[in-house]
UniProtKB/Swiss-Prot annotation:
Domain Nudix hydrolase: 6-149
Necessary cofactors: a divalent metal cation
Species of the source: Blochmanniella floridana
Domain of life of the native organism: Bacteria
Keyword DNA damage: no
Gene from which this protein is expressed: rppH
E.C. numbers: 3.6.1.-
Residue positions of motif Nudix box: 38-59
A single GO BP: mRNA catabolic process
Broad EC category: hydrolase
GO molecular function, one term: mRNA 5'-diphosphatase activity
A UniProt-annotated Pfam family: NUDIX
Function: Accelerates the degradation of transcripts by removing pyrophosphate from the 5'-end of triphosphorylated RNA, leading to a more labile monophosphorylated state that can stimulate subsequent ribonuclease cleavage.
Protein name per UniProt: RNA pyrophosphohydrolase
Family recorded in the similarity comment: Belongs to the Nudix hydrolase family. RppH subfamily.
């Protein structure tokens, strides 16, 4: 779903463990790493989209996690000009994201990157909460920084 400003409505997921680490996933057959994220379909709430993406991308269900927090506002990033698909309509210029902080309740052996026909990720690891800000692709860094600042107290108090 793309809004009137050309932003695709999207959810992002920060999954933390009991040690204050966050799940960091490598995109399938690529060198880039990121948090799980995905689009909101027409008729879906952000929470419904988050649970769908959680299963599609890392194989977890609602019973495997607990929602600790949701960002107060939507965060946006623009795609670099060379990544915009100019011939595809409606035109998507970037993402408008609502972020969820989830606590993993199950064992991390339940994480499964191969639950969908099309894999988003091929591997994952636990990392310190600030690591992703320095490692994510440059045009997402400002969003990651804002999200982590909003979630930091909840992550380190686990």
């Amino acid at each position: 779903m793309i809004d009137d400003n050309g932003y695709r409505l999207n959810v992002g997921i920060v999954l933390c463990n009991t040690y204050g680490q966050v799940l960091w996933a490598k995109r399938y057959k690529q060198c880039s790493w990121q948090f799980p994220q995905g689009g909101i379909n027409i008729g879906e709430t952000p929470e419904q989209a988050m649970y769908r993406e959680l299963f599609e991308e890392i194989g977890l269900n609602y019973c495997d996690v607990r929602i600790l927090s949701i960002t107060r506002c939507w965060f946006c990033y623009k795609l670099p000009t060379q990544l915009v698909r100019w011939r595809i309509k409606p035109l998507c210029l970037g993402q408008k994201q609502k972020w969820f902080l989830l606590k993993l309740l199950s064992k991390d052996t339940k994480i499964n990157m191969k639950t969908s026909k099309v894999c988003t990720f091929d591997t994952w690891q636990w990392v310190s909460l600030w690591y992703p800000i320095r490692q994510v692709v440059f045009f997402k860094r400002h969003v990651y920084r804002k999200v982590m600042k909003e979630f930091v107290k909840l992550i380190i108090s686990r």
